[in-house]
Amino acid sequence: MSFTTIFYIGFGGALGAILRSFTNGFVSKIFPNLSFPLGTLSVNIIGGFFIGFLMSLASNINIDINLKSFLVTGFLGGLTTFSTFSYENMLLLQSGNYTNAFLNIASNLLLSLLFCYFGFWIVKVMYA
């Protein structure tokens, strides 16, 4: 892997992490009393959609390796988060909020996968 590719991954990751932080803050301001990690769910659904879209697009057109690395590995890797998802569920379980923990786990898995497929499907329709 070239230094240039590593740079693009790092730069994309930084931007994705910044957007994740802004998204979490924005969602917290809209729903200040919500005891559900909606910000993390939001970024994981958005990331699921865009990785499906971009990977499907990459199978139909030639995307520069640095651009793909920036967008997929860097930006979407920084935007989405499994570690925060895990931590938030641990907190929900420790506080006895089993319903929200279950809903959060199911929502993240099912909706992220559904939106990933939706992004993939959009490109499939575009190139049919």
UniProtKB/Swiss-Prot annotation:
Q: Where does Na(+) bind?
A: 77, 80
Which UniProt keywords are listed? Cell inner membrane, Cell membrane, Ion channel, Ion transport, Membrane, Metal-binding, Sodium, Transmembrane, Transmembrane helix, Transport
Q: Which reaction does it catalyse?
A: fluoride(in) = fluoride(out)
Residues annotated as coiled-coil are none
**Which cellular component appears as one GO term in the record?**
plasma membrane
* Protein's GO biological process: cellular detoxification of fluoride
Q: Which Pfam families match?
A: CRCB
How the protein is activated or inhibited is described as: Na(+) is not transported, but it plays an essential structural role and its presence is essential for fluoride channel function.
Question: GO molecular-function annotation terms?
Answer: fluoride channel activity; metal ion binding
Q: Which InterPro entries match?
A: FluC
Topology of this chain in the membrane: Multi-pass membrane protein
**Transmembrane residue ranges:** 3-23, 34-54, 65-85, 102-122
Enumerate the subcellular locations listed in this protein's record, separating them with semicolons.
Answer: Cell inner membrane
| Role of this protein | Fluoride-specific ion channel. Important for reducing fluoride concentration in the cell, thus reducing its toxicity.
NCBIfam families per UniProt: crcB (TIGR00494)
Family membership: Belongs to the fluoride channel Fluc/FEX (TC 1.A.43) family.
Please identify the protein, giving its name as recorded. Fluoride-specific ion channel FluC
Q: Which organism is it from?
A: Campylobacter fetus subsp. fetus (strain 82-40)
